């Protein structure tokens, strides 16, 4: 855990906060989606995320940087947005149909898939430690779900 962009372990604190909020999201979504069309629920959630995101952009005065974004970055940000939308639509439908205790672990298999994709497309290292970690996550997911 090294120092990068803002101090030692700062990224780690944000990652832990992300995990906490993701856990809250799952529980709140499971309760909130009851009796609501999953696509409508995703749209409502997206409006809230959109308002919060743009609020932070203006609060931090980051809107001036929009003109500096390259075409390549725009393309990949748009593709990422499409992938996020597809993920959320599938996630909400799965939560509506299944138990949070089963849906969430399967959703977190994204960690394994991300590591493999990062190795293949971003040429990031995939060490023996990474392989063991992926195998443990996959095995743990199967253990919790089956």
Language-model segment annotations:
Residues 1-17, 36, 50-77, 88-97, ...:
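Membrane-interface interhelical linkers
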Residues 13, 17-20, 44-48, 75, ...:
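Hydrophobic residues within alpha-helical transmembrane segments
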Residues 1, 129-145:
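Hydrophobic transmembrane alpha-helices of multi-pass small-molecule transport proteins
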Residues 19-23, 27, 54, 81-86, ...:
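Hydrophobic/small/kink-forming positions within alpha-helical transmembrane segments
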Residues 112-131:
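C-terminal transmembrane-helix exit sites in multi-pass transporters
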Residues 96-97, 125, 141-146:
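Juxtamembrane boundary at the C-terminal end of a transmembrane helix
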Residues 34-40, 90-109:
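Structural motif at transmembrane-helix junctions in multi-pass transporters
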Residues 24-48, 102:
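Juxtamembrane helix-loop-helix junctions in multi-pass membrane proteins
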């Amino acid at each position: 855990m090294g120092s990068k962009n803002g101090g030692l372990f700062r990224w780690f604190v944000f990652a832990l906060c992300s995990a906490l909020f993701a856990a809250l999201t799952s529980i709140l979504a499971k309760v909130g989606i009851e009796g609501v069309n999953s696509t409508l629920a995703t749209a409502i959630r997206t409006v809230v995320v959109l308002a919060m995101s743009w609020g932070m952009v203006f609060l931090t005065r980051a809107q001036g940087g929009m003109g500096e974004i390259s075409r390549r970055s725009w393309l990949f940000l748009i593709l990422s947005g499409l992938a996020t939308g597809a993920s959320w639509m599938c996630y909400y439908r799965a939560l509506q149909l299944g138990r949070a205790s089963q849906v969430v672990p399967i959703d977190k298999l994204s960690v394994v898939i991300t590591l493999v994709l990062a190795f293949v497309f971003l040429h990031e290292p995939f060490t023996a430690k990474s392989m063991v970690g992926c195998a443990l996550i996959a095995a743990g997911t199967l253990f919790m779900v089956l």
